[in-house]
Amino acid sequence: DGNGGYWTPQNYGGGYAGPSTLRLGIEKSRNLMTVRLAKDMGMDLVAAYAERFGIYDHLKPYLPMALGAGETTVLRMVTAYSVIANGGRSIEPSLIDRVQDRYGRTVYKHDQRFCADCNTREYDGQAEPQLVDERDQVLDPMTAYQITSMMEGVVQRGTATRVKALGVPVAGKTGTTNDEKDAWFVGFTPDLVCGVYLGYDNPQPMGHGATGGGLAAPVFIDFMKEALKGKKPVDFKVPEG
């Protein structure tokens, strides 16, 4: 730290799990693996990606930041996860989806993607209409899918297994800060991203076992059950390559 002390990261609950794959480390939320990876990559690169995803404006390239030591907002986190869910393309959050006049005509829409043939009234063997998406590609689509697949493992085998109760394809990541002062879960289906944060206005421990998987994930489940009601499950799209 700034006073000449030492920073000693630990896995949640202590202990060392030994060598593991990146996939397993993410599923089990192992801090030490994350820190070693950030050190090998270089924190300048980690900071650059955090800024590219919009999580921070100016992230200091210090190793504790790899475990979320910097402060951000739920909106910024959800926006960053939306980039992954969107195949690596940037997302601009908005409270307004569209505005229509009293005759039902759309006078404004937030989504500016263009589709020349989407209003075709009849299908006669023509090619499927294509959306022209000019949003910035901030992450390679194959990398975005690999990250999605790893975070599906968090739900299937890792720290958020209770989210499997939704019965649809879901990817996500839990988060728990030191002394269990904050609990996070940010997750997504192919169509919807949701972030949950629990903690006091003045940071203080929420109690033993107050983890992202134990506290935040159930809130995510309750919301998604209602949001996805009546919708057919959709698999995550695998990009070419």
Give the positions of each predicted feature.
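A penicillin-recognizing enzyme superfamily signal
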Residues: 24-28, 73-241
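Active-site-adjacent helix/loop patches that line small-molecule binding or acyl-intermediate pockets
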Residues: 1-86
